[in-house]
């Protein structure tokens, strides 16, 4: 079982990374800068396990900062700990998406708008590709050893999950949706970016494409400045106030 979030002697640094990774997991994460990260399953993903099968997407993870999950970010702790609050499993952090266009395409596919006919055509194309992939993978499985066969089984499980999502989306394809054009990319200002991401988040819930979501307004140790309100210095440095509260 995952260990509760009790501080350990000698690990006083890395507080920012530990804060984000503990927020929805409630565990004390493993101190590492490498790929051997370990936290715990987050609350949103526990909920997604229960209600996510009924929607096209089990969950949606959004952010406003760029959110890498590789490398070191905070005093010996991996960037995965600082840059996401959603963990599918103790070793699988879910990257938070900060590009409105990518979020739109995840919700509605590579269409220009939420138009029902365009969505259905895209779904049928996706299904055709998955049918081909599944057939090829099943044929390959018969020639593999036990270890490789196990890995391929995990891959096929993921493919079947995508197939389930497509089937759910096809059943919902004729549903009326608010008119929403595909975003071009990340807006120039923080205010515009935040509003667009909130609009997409709301749209995902309104259309029942998902019922579970997380939104990380700023990653830990963010250097974002806010010139719109007269703050030209980075948030993290300003928050310390020269260590003089």
Stretch-by-stretch model annotation:
Residues 1-245:
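Ligand-binding pockets and gating/stacking loops
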């Amino acid at each position: 079982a995952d260990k509760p979030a009790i501080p350990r002697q000698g690990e006083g640094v890395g507080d920012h990374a530990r804060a984000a990774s503990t927020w929805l997991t409630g565990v004390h994460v493993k101190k590492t800068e490498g790929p051997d990260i370990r936290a715990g399953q987050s609350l949103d993903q526990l909920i997604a396990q229960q209600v996510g099968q009924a929607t096209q997407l089990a969950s949606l993870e959004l952010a406003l900062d760029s959110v890498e999950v590789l490398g070191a970010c905070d005093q010996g702790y991996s960037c995965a700990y600082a840059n996401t609050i959603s963990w599918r499993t103790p070793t699988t952090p879910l990257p938070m998406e900060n590009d409105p266009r990518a979020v739109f395409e995840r919700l509605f596919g590579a269409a220009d708008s939420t138009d029902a006919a365009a969505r259905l055509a895209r779904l049928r194309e996706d299904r055709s590709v998955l049918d081909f992939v599944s057939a090829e993978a099943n044929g390959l499985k018969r020639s593999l050893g036990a270890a490789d066969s196990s890995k391929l089984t995990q891959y096929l499980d993921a493919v079947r999950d995508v197939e389930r999502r497509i089937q759910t989306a096809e059943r919902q394809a004729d549903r009326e949706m608010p008119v929403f054009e595909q975003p071009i990319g990340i807006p120039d200002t923080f205010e515009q970016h935040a509003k667009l991401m909130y609009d997409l988040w709301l749209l995902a819930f309104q259309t029942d494409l998902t019922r579970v979501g997380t939104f990380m307004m700023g990653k830990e140790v963010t250097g974002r400045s806010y010139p719109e309100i007269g703050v030209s210095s980075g948030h993290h440095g300003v928050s310390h106030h020269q260590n003089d509260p």
